[in-house]
């Protein structure tokens, strides 16, 4: 099949020439596409959401200007930020960033955020499918890594569903609401790549 043809991957159609894909869930219809500079305000609103922010390792009050600059600048090859959009509202985002160090270029880190009212409705799963399809089939990343708060059971279950395995426990990893919290490190290997031992 020519590379420009759409193909079914994990229940979602992916075509490199398409800029977005529509997803319909029982009570939600949204699109997933690459983030653009004009999405900066929506991404900031998502990150500021109380249900989202507590699980992120970021400082409060992200600025739209800083995010717009990030989205406007040339990123490293392979880096991507996808957004889930419902009626103009950014309801979720997933980012994948490769490591720039020579001996770690086979690894990428990712982060996921879904707004409270869209959680447990398939948005996180749809974003994960899109990101994994991109990482496995269009990049040379061998492993995808993440760090998650140790008490974020919903996120951990989602990551395990997509093949991530726990690799370690980081004690007192991050400050959340004035307390130091533990985190887990998890990783997933690209099944299409040969693993050199």
Predicted regions, residues:
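Conserved active-site alpha-helix within GNAT-family acetyltransferase domains
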Residues: 121, 125, 150-168
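Conserved GNAT acetyl-CoA-binding A-motif
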Residues: 136-147
């Amino acid at each position: 099949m020519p590379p420009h043809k759409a193909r079914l991957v994990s229940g979602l159609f992916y075509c490199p020439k398409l800029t977005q894909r529509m997803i319909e869930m029982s009570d939600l219809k949204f699109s997933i596409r690459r983030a653009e500079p004009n999405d900066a305000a929506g991404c900031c609103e998502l990150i500021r959401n109380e249900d989202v922010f507590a699980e992120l390792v970021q400082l409060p009050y992200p600025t739209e200007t800083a995010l717009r600059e990030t989205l406007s600048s040339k990123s490293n090859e392979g880096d991507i930020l996808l957004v889930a959009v419902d009626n103009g509202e950014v309801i979720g985002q997933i980012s994948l960033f490769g490591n720039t160090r020579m001996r770690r270029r086979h690894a990428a880190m990712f982060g996921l955020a879904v707004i409270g009212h869209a959680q447990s409705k398939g948005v996180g799963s749809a974003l994960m499918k899109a990101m994994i399809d991109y990482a496995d089939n269009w990049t040379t990343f061998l492993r995808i890594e993440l760090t998650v708060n140790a008490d974020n059971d919903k996120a951990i279950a989602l990551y395990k569903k997509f093949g991530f395995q726990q690799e370690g426990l980081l004690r007192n990893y991050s400050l959340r609401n004035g307390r130091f919290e533990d985190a887990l490190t998890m990783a997933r290997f690209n099944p299409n790549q040969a693993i050199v031992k």
